[in-house]
A protein has these predicted regions:
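A charged, aromatic-enriched C-terminal amphipathic alpha-helix characteristic of glycosyltransferases
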Residues: 360-368, 374-428
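An aromatic- and histidine-rich active-site surface loop
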Residues: 129-148
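Conserved catalytic-core segment of nucleotide-activated headgroup transferases in glycan assembly
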Residues: 64-78, 211-216, 221-290, 295
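A short, histidine- and acid-enriched strand-loop-helix "catalytic/donor-clamping" loop
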Residues: 151-167
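Donor nucleotide-sugar binding/catalytic pocket of nucleotide-sugar-dependent glycosyltransferases
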Residues: 178-216, 225
Length: 442
């Protein structure tokens, strides 16, 4: 018997098709000023409206200003006829896709999501849908795409919003996952958590790194110096991370260069605190420059959650693996110092592969870790360990790998399963209530 949710979608589909996709409808036109949605078309996009589309659904802009953007571009690199759909604008810049649209104002009911999808894709044909979900919007939009166009649906989880924290309802996630022919996650803990909860197979696709930047041979160790110095990469996902790290580093007698987004729309990243901590902010720089810069340091700091009561959302922090960790070790083999809880995915990753150390938000512990990691023998050991796994983290051929995997409904090969063979993905979860109001849908 048809599940009531699917039955509801079937009714919506036929009703909206009659309204929006009837044969007598006029040809699709670009929305004019004041229209609900504006579709931005790339100068290189085909004019053939019968071309099969690869639709990519994200929460916000695909841009270099946050970690998701570069990764989305890498895994979809070279795909033809990409139509990028997002729920909202947060960064002021989007530079991805042959066509892109922001579905704002956001849908409030299931019917509105169906209508929005059919409005922007009227008279088009969709082959595949790649969904990188974070908000409820991405789930509903992807369900509508799958139902209305019969496209193959792939989910690529980069962050958790359902298992460790309940920002997305279980019923919605279950409906969405049941529709997916391929389910991917960036790391084993995220894979296992969703696999265990929903009884559906997930596979791993890590945050791959540009092949042109991947270092093949072990990089040389750097000579020791009297003053501690290193780099800082990654994002601050909670104000407490920033405050704690600045406080810790201010007592470590160190010089740190920060390469990352210093203008967060959500947190107060005080320049005064940076100066006191010995941190020089360089902002976001092109990845090829970042790879060269990282080769100049004995270690790189990546902040993660402390997983305590000072944080606003330990659930998201507990199940996330910062992609910049993989970027650093693959491009420069630089040892990684995780500052935060040893129970986070970042800490587990560096310990499993022997590419770094973990220290809590404590100045004595962080100073001692910096000193140990700067010693020649530690440099040699960690850089050799990084060199062993770097080639597997390359994005060489990854867009073809993903396209083929979506087509057959399983990983095209076992390269990533082999990489994480023997990896302990079990993780202690303390489920949290929602801290954000997902759109109230019915």
């Amino acid at each position: 018997m048809l599940d009531p949710v699917f039955a509801q979608n079937k009714v919506l589909r036929h009703r909206l098709f009659d309204l929006v996709l009837n044969h007598g409808a006029p040809p699709i036109q670009q929305p004019q000023a004041g229209a609900p949605f504006t579709i931005v078309t790339s100068p290189t996009a085909t004019s053939d409206l019968t071309a099969l589309l690869n639709v990519v659904v994200t929460a916000n802009e695909v841009t270099h200003l946050h970690g998701t953007g570069p990764l989305v571009k890498r895994v979809c690199g070279g795909w033809p006829n990409v139509f990028s759909i997002r729920a909202r604008n947060d960064w002021g810049r989007h530079d991805f896709g042959d066509w892109n649209v922001c579905l704002s104002p956001r849908g409030r009911t299931r019917a509105e999501f169906f209508q929005n999808v059919l409005t922007v894709l009227r008279n088009r044909n969709v082959r595949n849908v790649l969904c990188i979900p974070f908000l409820a919007d991405e789930f509903y939009t992807s369900i509508a795409l799958h139902e209305c166009f019969g496209a193959k649906l792939c989910v690529y989880l980069m962050d958790d919003q359902n298992v460790a924290t309940h920002n997305i309802p279980d019923a919605l996630v279950r409906e969405f996952l049941n529709r997916c022919s391929l389910r991917l996650a960036t790391h084993p803990e995220l894979q296992k958590s969703y696999q265990d909860k929903y009884g559906l197979r997930f596979s791993v696709l890590p945050a791959v790194v540009p092949a042109s930047l991947t270092a093949r041979d072990p990089s040389p160790s750097l000579p020791s110096t009297e003053q501690r110095y290193g780099a800082l990469i990654g994002s601050f996902w909670d104000q407490s991370w920033y405050d704690r790290l600045c406080d810790v580093l201010s007592k470590c007698d160190c010089r740190i260069d920060w390469f990352g987004n210093t203008k967060s729309p959500w947190f107060n990243l005080s320049p005064k605190h940076l100066r006191k901590a010995g941190i020089t902010a360089h902002g976001v720089i092109p990845e090829h420059q970042l790879a060269r810069k990282l080769a100049q340091y004995p270690f790189v700091i990546v902040p993660v959650g402390a997983l305590d009561t000072r944080e606003s959302n330990t659930g998201v922090a507990r199940l996330s693996l910062p992609g910049r960790i993989l970027f650093a070790i693959a491009t420069s083999h630089i040892p990684v110092l995780i500052v935060g809880s040893e129970k986070t995915c970042g800490a587990r990753f560096v310990k499993h592969f022997g590419v770094g150390e973990v220290a809590p938000y404590d100045s004595s512990a962080v100073s001692a870790a910096m000193d140990r990691m700067s010693r020649p023998e530690a440099q040699r050991r960690m850089r050799q360990a990084a060199a062993k796994i770097a080639p597997v983290l390359s994005d060489d051929g990854i867009s073809d790998w993903l396209a083929k995997s979506i087509e057959v409904g399983e990983p095209a090969d076992m390269r990533f399963e082999d990489l994480f063979s023997g990896y302990d993905a079990s993780i202690e979860l303390h489920s949290e209530p929602s801290i954000a109001t997902a759109v109230g849908l019915r």
